[in-house]
């Protein structure tokens, strides 16, 4: 992992007060120096959302809003306590160096929710969740809400990262699996097994899209009994989708979270996908 210090690379002045702020950063928990969980709360009543949707959060710098969208990891039923987001610090990024400098209690602007990446209602098939990096957040929200509703659905959760330390929500997911709190099979994988930071890793290796086919074979996941949801790196999303389509999954059974920065559309994205993403 790269040791990143936000303060050392960003000197922009964040405006602490602005009449357009409507929320507060109420809590933060660091996983390590470049991954953290943030909780942001609206000033008034919470805005309802569906598990899988995202909020856009930001601050004002020189009178202009600097903001980015992030999937919500907390359950909709707990929105009154704030919206949880799992975020990576991007060195030289536009927004995250600002976010990393904010103290708990800082004022922010939050808008949303947006997004169509939500569970199909009344779908009793196995849920295959495929994520890379911080793309696991919407799935955690879905599972948390399912538990609160008393209706958890059988799930297989593939989580791909570069380093073992990057596995967000690992204790939660391992706890659900080991204790039977949620009917989930959790399968993490690291893509750089030879790196010193992964010296103690004994689990699966390779990019998460590379294990989709083998896991389907091992667990008997087919187009008849499984619906897939994919979130994370755009190129990963398209590669994982291609594997599932090759295995006979219909397009309607492969759900994708499609937001990426304008001008950074992945190779292979269709015109309709790019247009749909822009609409978000």
Placement of each model-derived feature along the sequence:
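Reductase modules of NAD(P)H-dependent flavoproteins
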Residues: 2-21, 158, 163-280
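Ferredoxin-reductase
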Residues: 6-104, 191-192
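Short, Lys/Arg- and Gly-enriched loop/turn segments at beta-strand edges
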Residues: 63-71, 115-122, 266-267
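Helix-loop module immediately N-terminal to the HCX5R catalytic loop
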Residues: 106-117, 206, 210-215
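Ser/Thr-glycine-rich phosphate-binding loops at phosphate-binding pockets of nucleotides
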Residues: 132-136
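Histidine-anchored nucleotide/phosphate-binding helix
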Residues: 138-148
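Conserved S-adenosyl-L-methionine
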Residues: 148-154
């Amino acid at each position: 992992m790269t040791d990143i210090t936000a303060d050392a690379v960003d000197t922009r002045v964040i405006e602490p007060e602005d009449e357009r702020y409507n929320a507060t950063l109420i809590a933060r928990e660091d996983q390590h120096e470049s991954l953290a969980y943030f909780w942001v709360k609206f000033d008034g009543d919470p805005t309802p959302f569906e598990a899988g949707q995202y909020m856009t959060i930001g601050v004002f710098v020189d009178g202009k809003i600097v903001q980015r969208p992030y999937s919500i990891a907390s359950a909709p039923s707990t929105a009154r306590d704030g919206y949880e987001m799992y975020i990576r610090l991007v060195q030289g990024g536009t927004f995250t160096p600002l976010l990393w400098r904010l103290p708990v209690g800082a004022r922010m602007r939050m808008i949303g929710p947006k997004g169509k990446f939500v569970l199909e209602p009344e779908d009793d098939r196995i849920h295959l969740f495929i994520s890379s990096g911080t793309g696991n957040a919407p799935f955690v929200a879905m599972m948390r809400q399912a538990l609160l509703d008393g209706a958890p659905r059988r799930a297989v959760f593939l989580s791909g990262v570069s380093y073992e330390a990057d596995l967000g929500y690992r204790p939660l997911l391992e706890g659900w699996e080991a204790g039977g709190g949620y009917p989930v099979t959790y399968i993490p994988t690291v893509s750089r097994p030879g790196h010193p930071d992964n010296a103690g890793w004994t689990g699966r290796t390779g990019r998460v899209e590379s294990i989709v086919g083998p896991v389907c074979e091992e667990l008997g996941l087919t187009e008849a009994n499984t619906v897939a949801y994919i979130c994370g790196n755009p190129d990963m999303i398209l590669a994982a989708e291609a594997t599932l389509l090759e295995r006979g999954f219909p397009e309607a059974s492969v759900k994708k979270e499609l937001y990426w920065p304008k001008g950074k559309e992945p190779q292979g994205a269709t015109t309709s996908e790019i247009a749909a993403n822009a609409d978000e």
